Amino acid sequence: VAYSGLVDGDTFNGTYTGAFSDKNVGTGKTVTITPSYTGADVSNYSITNHADVTANITVRSLNVSGVTASDKTYDGSVTATMNSSSAVYSGFVSGDDFAASYSGVFADANVGTGKTVTITSSYAGADVSNYNITDQTSTTADISAKALTATASASNKVYDGSSAATVTLSLSGFVGSETVTSTNSSTFSDKNVGTGKT
């Protein structure tokens, strides 16, 4: 800092603080200077303070990690339930108005472990534009098999010398209109006449 008009040898010191007009990203932003002067000879001067200056505030990098997807039972869809309770926002300035939401889809609807879930991120809040955000793009989760319930009924028959049985098998618990084809080979416990035979 140059002091025009300062007499050589005088005891005079100046310190300065500055404040931007606001905290947000921008170029050529006004910085208001607040001076403080000390020294034995300060009272000998009528001081014209430094004019305000300009400077830039650039975007801050923000890296997102730790978003997870919940395992699920097969339901015929690729939709994943996301969990951001353990998300980490590296570079976030505490107190900023910033909110994040996430949706996810499995690579396919089929049963499997460690399946890739693609993450779609959405951010809101007054301070979002102050960040250059590197999204978390994927995670993994499992799809487990859905249980089906089988019911069976055997047909009565007239003694024919064999233990062969005719059984009708019914399955319930399918997703939507899905079905499977099933076959069975069934026999009575023996070939003889009886009631309530296994």
Question: What residue ranges belong to the model's regions?
Answer:
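Short loop/turn motifs that initiate or flank beta-strands
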Residues: 1-198
